[in-house]
From Swiss-Prot:
It comes from the Eukaryota. Disulfide bonds: none annotated. It is found in: Plastid, Chloroplast. The lineage of its organism: Eukaryota, Sar, Stramenopiles, Ochrophyta, Bacillariophyta. This is Protein CfxQ homolog. Its main location: plastid. Belongs to the CbxX/CfxQ family. The keyword DNA damage does not apply. Keywords: ATP-binding, Chloroplast, Nucleotide-binding, Plastid. ATP binds at residues 71-78. The keyword Plastid applies. GO terms for cellular component: chloroplast. It comes from Trieres chinensis. Necessary for the expression of RuBisCO.
Length: 291
């Protein structure tokens, strides 16, 4: 039997990892985002097959693991980052499997000599896991000659290149400024193999997310409240600073407060469980979005 006939049981190797469980959780926890889920599955497949090839002595350059997540706030970028760190850990590409989320303030100092120690300290904490840099484009401020963000980028570039077996970096933020950021920093762009775009949620998807959020907290929408919330989401999507699932969560928090005040103002009556669970249309319609 030649070495080329050496075999490996794919299903057995797949079952040894928890990738199926992680991908299923991703499907359950995140509404929509079909193209994102598809890309994560593709990356997981590549990493698994690469591992099997190595086990059989087939050598090739390690796949690029650094990633870019672009999209509006509240579209699941951090959640997907967490799942990606789980997949990388299960397949042995990172040693610890933790995800460290940071922003510019965690990396860049305010005076000379302050940035390098800050950035190196963050990198030290992230080693063996995934470093998730949110709104990464704020690292680069070309209009300010005294800005120290470029120093953090230089250190980051070195680590992404020289310690890629110990750390995976995910750069995240709005698509347009991220594209400009990469244009201005081609060294960063060339080190990122996986660019994933996160689409905004539709009204229907956001309504489904709302119901899931409420169910977790043992609330439910009445039929009229569901109609009102659908109208709210459609209107809110057209307003500035809309943050998808994050904006919906904030709206539901306010609806819960209005529900509590409505019930509180009717004290003296006997309350049923249904009344404590139900969010009514008026709890939604009191929002200033309807003014």
């Amino acid at each position: 039997m030649s070495s080329m006939d050496t075999s490996v049981n794919l299903q057995e190797e797949y079952n040894k990892t928890e990738i199926a469980k992680i991908l299923n959780l991703l499907n359950e926890e995140l509404v929509g985002l079909v193209p994102v889920k598809s890309r994560i599955r593709e990356i997981a497949a590549l990493l698994l097959i690469d591992k099997l090839r190595k086990n059989l002595g087939i050598t090739a350059g390690s796949p690029g693991l650094h990633m870019s997540f672009t999209g509006s706030p509240g579209t699941g970028k951090t959640t997907v980052g967490l799942k990606m760190s789980d997949i990388l850990f299960q397949l042995g590409y990172i040693k610890k499997g933790h995800l460290l989320t940071v922003t510019r303030d965690d990396l860049v100092g305010q005076y000379i000599g302050h940035t390098a120690p800050k950035t190196k300290e963050v990198l030290k904490k992230a080693m063996g896991g995934v470093l998730f840099i949110d709104e990464a484009y704020y690292l680069y401020k070309p209009d300010n000659e005294r800005d120290y963000g470029s120093e953090a980028i230089e250190i980051l570039l070195q680590v992404m290149e020289n310690q890629r077996d110990d750390l995976v970096v995910i750069l995240a933020g709005y698509k347009e400024p991220m594209d400009k950021f990469y244009e201005s920093n081609p060294g960063l762009s060339s080190r990122i193999a996986n660019h994933i775009d996160f689409p905004d949620y539709t009204v229907e998807e956001l309504l489904k997310i709302s119901k899931m959020m409420l169910e977790e907290q043992q609330y439910q929408l009445t039929t009229q409240a569901e109609v009102a919330l659908t109208q709210y989401i459609a209107k809110r999507k057209e307003k500035p600073l809309f943050a998808n699932a994050r904006s919906v969560k904030n709206a539901l928090d306010r609806a819960r407060m209005r529900q509590a005040n409505r019930i509180f103002d009717s004290r003296g009556q006997i309350l049923t469980k249904k009344e404590l669970v139900n969010i009514e249309a008026e709890d939604i319609l009191q929002s200033t979005i309807f003014d």
